Amino acid sequence: MVKPTDYLTVTALTQYLKAKFERDPYLDRVYLTGEISNFRLRPNAHQYFSLKDNKAKISAIMFKSAFEKVKFTPEEGMKVLIVGRISLYEASGNYQIYVERMEPDGLGALYQAYEQLKAKLATEGLFDAPKQPLVRFPKRIAVITSPSGAVIRDIITTTQRRYPIAQLVLFPAVVQGDGAADVLVERLKQVNEHGDFDTIIIGRGGGSIEDLWPFNEERVARAIVASQIPVISSVGHETDTTIADLVADVRAATPTAAAELATPVLTDEILKLQQQRLRLYQAFSKTVALNKKQLDHLQNSYVLKQPKRLYDGYLQNVDQLQRRLLTAQQQLLKDRRQQVQLLQQRLMAQSPLMAVRQAQKDVTEQQRRLNQAMNRLMADRRQKAAQVIAALDLVSPLKILGRGFAYVTDDQQQMLKKVADFKTQQPIELHVQDGLVTAEVVATHKGEE
């Protein structure tokens, strides 16, 4: 019979199975190929997905530190090659693969990442964005590259040969390996912060796709696009084309070509200036000679020898114009006088004095009518006031007192109207027509109702 102690807990069984997985040397390093399923990119976090074929599926997890080393972006349905270890997740009891490395099945991981980024930036229009023109005669050129490679030597040699008056400033950078992309971005920012450079040359010599990879990083490409200073990219050999080459303002096949694009040939420019100076001198001399010839011709002309003949014909015209002007002025004054006289006659006919006199008559008549209306109104008001006074007099208390009546108040001047208001021996006051009588209540008798 099975004892209770023979039963395992779920935790104990799960831990036992997990130990089996982790101790199995065949499961400690597993190479899998399959199709990505249930993948949703989680920025700056662990990635959870499944790997499947046509018959089976296994859960997969890739920690953030391992996923940051993946050069391409995994996509749903993509076939990949995975290296990892198999273990069991105790909380769910599911076994899964912990992915340590992943790359596309078929294409190399770097090439896949290159194509993905190239398509992304092309969709954003970064490759077709307007390019900054290079400064024709640069004073200062910033070079971002390795301080020990052949690139900087070629650029220095070419620049000194072609345009020695330009100042080259090296911004040393790591151009391959981990951290190189961050250094390149930082150097681009430093050059732009200085603000006194005319051109930037960024690049390195040839190498494998892994060696050139920092120049295919998205952050480097965006730093080049954001640069306010024109950027010449010279990465790898002529057959190598990096993302940096595609977004730069100008791409150079070699470092020497980059220096040639950045600088003119000083001797050629001096020769051009000399030729332009000679052409300018010849043109100026020709113009001076032509003007001198024209001046001599004018000085010897018949007209200039007798200049009065130039304006003899105009003097007669001036006299005629003066006479016509005088006649026109006189006629204009005559017309204006006639107009003034006519206006004066009209004003006299419509003199304001007549209007004022008529207005005075109107005002006098209005005052007369107003006085009559006021007199009628006052008489009417006096009559109505007399009627009101007579009506008031009929109901006046004094009038009633005059007919022999009186009214009684107590010592507080309160009106006493009923028998109940009087008290025996209460002092009272009788108000009569011509004065006041003080009395005292002896007795009260209530009359019949």
Swiss-Prot record:
<comment type="subunit">
    <text>Heterooligomer composed of large and small subunits.</text>
</comment>
<keyword id="KW-0269">Exonuclease</keyword>
<keyword id="KW-0540">Nuclease</keyword>
<dbReference type="GO" id="GO:0005737">
    <property type="term" value="C:cytoplasm"/>
</dbReference>
<comment type="similarity">
    <text>Belongs to the XseA family.</text>
</comment>
<dbReference type="GO" id="GO:0008855">
    <property type="term" value="F:exodeoxyribonuclease VII activity"/>
</dbReference>
<protein>
    <recommendedName>
        <fullName>Exodeoxyribonuclease 7 large subunit</fullName>
        <ecNumber>3.1.11.6</ecNumber>
    </recommendedName>
</protein>
<keyword id="KW-0963">Cytoplasm</keyword>
<dbReference type="InterPro" id="IPR025824">
    <property type="entry name" value="OB-fold_nuc-bd_dom"/>
</dbReference>
<dbReference type="InterPro" id="IPR003753">
    <property type="entry name" value="Exonuc_VII_L"/>
</dbReference>
<dbReference type="InterPro" id="IPR020579">
    <property type="entry name" value="Exonuc_VII_lsu_C"/>
</dbReference>
<dbReference type="Pfam" id="PF02601">
    <property type="entry name" value="Exonuc_VII_L"/>
</dbReference>
<comment type="function">
    <text>Bidirectionally degrades single-stranded DNA into large acid-insoluble oligonucleotides, which are then degraded further into small acid-soluble oligonucleotides.</text>
</comment>
<keyword id="KW-0378">Hydrolase</keyword>
<dbReference type="GO" id="GO:0006308">
    <property type="term" value="P:DNA catabolic process"/>
</dbReference>
<dbReference type="Pfam" id="PF13742">
    <property type="entry name" value="tRNA_anti_2"/>
</dbReference>
<dbReference type="GO" id="GO:0003676">
    <property type="term" value="F:nucleic acid binding"/>
</dbReference>
<dbReference type="GO" id="GO:0009318">
    <property type="term" value="C:exodeoxyribonuclease VII complex"/>
</dbReference>
